[in-house]
């Protein structure tokens, strides 16, 4: 049975360093959980690895806690994970141990990596008498409760109510800045979101924080206030960095807070491609003028400018800037390979990059700049989110895809995509109806009425077989649409720009995107 160690125990980084002062954390092979390797480790190293794993386990369980109205009055705890509700600590521990071993392993690795960084720099920091902003403000304690808002003046129902689509709100934000102790930030963010009854996803790394959370407007307002007053972020974040949209806690199945190597998964170490060397930021107004100039050119294929969509194909499929180059890639981690494979396309070009909220462009533009082939690289500050706030009827047509249960936000009436079955204009995604398939499909009401609710012929056939019972667990995704899609497409040197009002046609695509 996993340890029930409280996540608060051992969170003080100095305590960890004192206990593990002789551990060579640079040798990351030590964290391999294989039994054969464990047998080769000496007792001291086993003990140290065990401590890190217990901490990772406790932090993971902590992120699965869900607030209840009674939690304000008593110490009752509930946990929600994988769409299941757990009422006792034993059951949630058993579930995490059996179903989330990989996540615990990666969290353990992250803890050890962060300790390695701290250990390697602690002596130099001490000799230089450099100050850590967090330690300066918290000289006596790293207790996260010191940085939680006072909500005693609010009725608990005020934080919970108003979470519906009309009254609630979803925040989207990121902040690139060096963080010395991501694990502490993780524990603090978990406690903060639980206190405010927020759900969502928050990624934390040594390079910063990236979050999207939903709840009542009171809860999101308090969250922003806390973030703007926190010592590590107050000089890097402003209120305008938080993009807002209608929604609430219901937009996310649960709260997920974790520590990763990157705050957006590009697949390249931040040490190799840093956020500190991005493309030039353009305000929505400046970007609008650049796009207007680009579209006014008689022959855009011969232009020295490329309008580049940094998102995945299923995002640009339902909304995009007119004349953009929208890579047919499924994940942002494919973007570097896409650039490498199409490097000549960008040679001597001015590149205007954009994404949903701006975060992918930060390191994406840094990667493109590092190739040394572009004239200039620009990025849309605040992303499509901020552009549409200022120009709802501008050059962006269609819907804005979002990574939550809303799937898309609408700022204009344009429909730029079509039903995968009949070609009628349609842009409302639904999950493929086949069990265990996590792809999205565009199928209009008429086609849905005829039973066409899967992402491809293979999945449609699976649905008709209605596999259930023990066999369902081994009924793996085998989508034709994914199998036939090139992982990294090669563009023509004179790329075909994307239209904004495609005519319906019989040759509709049958491929639906994977929701990641």
Curated annotation (Swiss-Prot):
Pfam families: Rhodanese (PF00581), Rhodanese_C (PF12368), TSTD2_N (PF23949), UPF0176_N (PF17773)
Entry annotation: catalytic residues: 355 (cysteine persulfide intermediate)
Taxonomic superkingdom: Eukaryota
Keywords attached to this entry: Phosphoprotein
Domain Rhodanese: 301-396
SMART domains according to UniProt: RHOD (SM00450)
Region listing for Disordered, in residue ranges: 490-516
Positions where Phosphoserine occurs in the chain: 269
Biased composition (Acidic residues): 506-516
InterPro entries referenced in this protein's UniProt entry, alphabetically: Rhodanese-like_dom (IPR001763), Rhodanese-like_dom_sf (IPR036873), Rhodanese_C (IPR022111), TrhO (IPR020936), TRHO_N (IPR040503)
UniProt protein name: Thiosulfate sulfurtransferase/rhodanese-like domain-containing protein 2
Organism: Pongo abelii
